[in-house]
Amino acid sequence: MHKTASQRLFPGPSYQNIKSIMEDSTILSDWTNSNKQKMKYDFSCELYRMSTYSTFPAGVPVSERSLARAGFYYTGVNDKVKCFCCGLMLDNWKLGDSPIQKHKQLYPSCSFIQNLVSASLGSTSKNTSPMRNSFAHSLSPTLEHSSLFSGSYSSLSPNPLNSRAVEDISSSRTNPYSYAMSTEEARFLTYHMWPLTFLSPSELARAGFYYIGPGDRVACFACGGKLSNWEPKDDAMSEHRRHFPNCPFLENSLETLRFSISNLSMQTHAARMRTFMYWPSSVPVQPEQLASAGFYYVGRNDDVKCFCCDGGLRCWESGDDPWVEHAKWFPRCEFLIRMKGQEFVDEIQGRYPHLLEQLLSTSDTTGEENADPPIIHFGPGESSSEDAVMMNTPVVKSALEMGFNRDLVKQTVQSKILTTGENYKTVNDIVSALLNAEDEKREEEKEKQAEEMASDDLSLIRKNRMALFQQLTCVLPILDNLLKANVINKQEHDIIKQKTQIPLQARELIDTILVKGNAAANIFKNCLKEIDSTLYKNLFVDKNMKYIPTEDVSGLSLEEQLRRLQEERTCKVCMDKEVSVVFIPCGHLVVCQECAPSLRKCPICRGIIKGTVRTFLS
């Protein structure tokens, strides 16, 4: 990356030659597709300004090249052009007009036109490659372009490695420190129009830079140094140190490791905002809030995902804070930690100390697994006292007096407390939530009734899933019959067969049957009747199977519990990748990251998925 003057002139080739070259480039292709993207480029570069004239009216008596050279880019409206530096807009061009002279006459204080004229008089205009520009001018935290070129280009040394001019200009200024941009979060929020995909705003903000525009121009909040024309392999912190080694921010900061990003195309605020074009207007959380917290819309219902940790959330409610939800469910997200700080994450996690344990404890519950999806309950010893407190507020009592089912009220209040950390404050809020919960519950019951009518066998298998894990021993014959009937493929067959222990084979087989549905359940029933009549009778005739826990894993660390779950299972949808996503609220861990977004209901308990938590193991 070299430090060069921002003025770039291209004498020599005719405009038609330049235009034909540009039309073959990605830059002009992007411009032609959408004039709205014009601010994607650094218009301090004459070549970029030239690219905007591809749709300039043919009858205008002033050449596009002379307009571009005078600092103007085309706005896309009639013959109106605009200066990239001072913002002057001109139109109604007439024969004999000189863009440079008109620019100088109407806006003599424009720093670009001043330097262009002085450079022309001094015959100092030279071709330069579009390398990184570094300036050490004073800057306030604004996106107004008129303040971007307050210094003299001629003061910069032609030697790209000589930083003397930068140091001299910097030392002559008053204090450039910007208190408004002193936090990483504040700097990050300035990048909503950031044009580059290969350099993330989070990295730039961490290196002390905030976005000022146009193009990819950024400035340091501490020393005021400016950089632009970033290249794919540039490191923001290294470039900062190289050009502004005496910056107080660099002297007082410790460079930390970069963090990995799950979806590179969504790392800018602007990119995430674009995904919310069809965001449902009924959702009470605004796209701006979600995008700022790292989330982008996946195009279904109100489902969003974090570009960094890939965590997914849905079913947003009035009063939800995306940052709080981010910290609650995905506390290891590095973007979250960078933006909000570890103290914020710890404070949110402190409100829900047993959240992950609760998810794990519900992932393999006993009893009727075809019943309503379990609500995440308080930890042992907390339930009775906290239940009494939360159910005795005036607002909750009012809801009970209206005739709402007590269990439904209790579940709704618990969900509210787990989501926001507080109970309902108004009767209107809780009544609205209860009405929605009733509608959702009725819909679930209808769907479950339809499923049970279609196949009572599948419901019995789901209900006795844990017991079947223990008691099913004739796995391979059933597996072969499923393959023969083309219910599963050879890969799915072999994955289950390769498990070294029968209980693991049984676990994989039962969960696969639940995912495959009625056809698999019928084959399972027929095979079991022939091979294991006792188990068949207990399951399908007497309907009286018992599950007896054989190992207490509660004493194991959460990480070890998760590790065991992952080692035991492959994704029940693709039967290829390892499971890595825990469903909320049921807590089942049965699918991989790629398959989870396509599911509305958990394939094991058929409960509606209201969120996902991706498991990260070191």
UniProtKB/Swiss-Prot annotation:
Q: Where is the CARD domain?
A: 453-543
Q: How is it modified after translation?
A: Auto-ubiquitinated and degraded by the proteasome in apoptotic cells.
Q: Where in the cell is it found?
A: Cytoplasm; Nucleus
The BIR repeats are at 46-113, 184-250, 269-336
Q: Which residues of the sequence carry a binding annotation for Zn(2+)?
A: 306, 309, 326, 333
Q: Which UniProt keywords apply?
A: Activator, Apoptosis, Cytoplasm, Metal-binding, Nucleus, Repeat, Transcription, Transcription regulation, Transferase, Ubl conjugation, Ubl conjugation pathway, Zinc, Zinc-finger
**Gene Ontology CC entries for this record:** CD40 receptor complex; cytoplasm; cytoplasmic side of plasma membrane; cytosol; nucleus; XY body
Q: What is its EC number?
A: 2.3.2.27
Pfam families per UniProt: BIR, CARD, UBA_BIRC2-3, zf-C3HC4_3
Q: What is its main location?
A: cytoplasm
Per UniProt, activity regulation is: The CARD domain inhibits the activation of E3 ubiquitin ligase activity by preventing RING domain dimerization and E2 ubiquitin donor binding and activation. The CARD domain-mediated autoinhibition of the E3 ubiquitin-protein ligase activity suppresses cell proliferation and migration. USP19 regulates the stability of BIRC2/c-IAP1 by preventing its ubiquitination.
Reactions mediated catalytically:
S-ubiquitinyl-[E2 ubiquitin-conjugating enzyme]-L-cysteine + [acceptor protein]-L-lysine = [E2 ubiquitin-conjugating enzyme]-L-cysteine + N(6)-ubiquitinyl-[acceptor protein]-L-lysine
* Molecular-function annotations in GO: cysteine-type endopeptidase inhibitor activity involved in apoptotic process; FBXO family protein binding; identical protein binding; protein-containing complex binding; protein-folding chaperone binding; transcription coactivator activity; transferase activity; ubiquitin binding
Assembly and partners are described as:
Interacts with DIABLO/SMAC and with PRSS25; these interactions inhibit apoptotic suppressor activity. Interacts with CASP9. Interacts (via BIR domains) with TRAF2; the interaction is required for IKBKE ubiquitination. Interacts with E2F1, RIPK1, RIPK2, RIPK3, RIPK4, BIRC5/survivin and USP19. HSP90AB1. Interacts with UBXN1. Interacts with GSK3B. Interacts with several death receptors, inclusing FAS, TNFRSF10A and TNFRSF10B. Recruited to TNFRSF10B in the absence of receptor stimulation. When TNFRSF10B is stimulated, further recruited to the receptor and cleaved by caspases.
Q: What does this protein do?
A: Multi-functional protein which regulates not only caspases and apoptosis, but also modulates inflammatory signaling and immunity, mitogenic kinase signaling, and cell proliferation, as well as cell invasion and metastasis. Acts as an E3 ubiquitin-protein ligase regulating NF-kappa-B signaling and regulates both canonical and non-canonical NF-kappa-B signaling by acting in opposite directions: acts as a positive regulator of the canonical pathway and suppresses constitutive activation of non-canonical NF-kappa-B signaling.
Official protein name in the record: Baculoviral IAP repeat-containing protein 2
